[in-house]
Amino acid sequence: MSDPLTAMNISREALSRASVLVVGDVMLDRYWYGEVDRISPEAPVPIVRITREEERNGGAANVAYNVVTLGARSSLLTVVGDDEASHKLEALVLGTGISAYFGRDPDLKTTVKLRVIGRQQQLLRLDFENTPRNEVLASQSAVFSSLLPDHQAVLFSDYGKGGLAHVADMIARARDAGKQILIDPKGSDFSRYRNASVITPNRVELRQVIGSWLDESDLQAKCQSLRQQLGLDAVLLTRSEEGMTLFDAEGQLHVNTQAREVFDVTGAGDTVIATMATLLAAGLSLRQALPLANRAGGLVVGKFGTAAVTYEELFA
């Protein structure tokens, strides 16, 4: 297989002209780091003495962050609460150069994932969340339409938090506008993603929809059937240590993972789909973008927490 970088001459300038609209569920990723040197007398749990705190973009915000880290432009459309976490998240997003379009629901608690870290490993995660009101979600529809002309690709990042209740309508409008449409899916109902360009489930997510498969031949048959039923251009199955497989009209294309030490898988799927969207927006085909997206996923698992891959790392 030819090197997509050489074949398509993907320069920094080419990526800087690419623009991806990210729509979906955002969250604030909080990390509390501490020292663990004793067990609580109240219960058989470690006592963590917090020494450092950190906050990062999470969910769809991390996807958009991955796009701009590669050197492309990204807009982020989402719904958040009107609380401390949402304002902190907005500041983080704007600080990375992402164009933020935050709809605010005063009844919504902005999703926060708080991870407690001790001895270089995650000890505990606390989630704070609820579901946005339909009226607030509907109000973002006009904003979505106004943003479409300025982007070559639209990426829907579904974390199942309720922010993509109107995704079917948005996909239809993006399709009519001739955009590349990428979906990071959630749940067992993939019919809501009908007519997207590509969906990127992992093995667990795919199994919820098509059931188990006997072998690679059975997997290919089921994925092709799903692709045709939903009118998708492709299904991209991410397979962790087994790499990833693209199922499209040409058949099946598999790329193996690049061997490296896995430090943290948090956000790896975000990096894969963000890289794919960026390269499609820059003019590559799905098959040309696949090896680079796979490489990006392999690089990011060597970093801690929600992270991103730079242009220099990807094209080293």
Residue ranges and their predicted role:
Residues 15, 148-149, 193-194:
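A short, aliphatic-rich alpha-helical micro-motif
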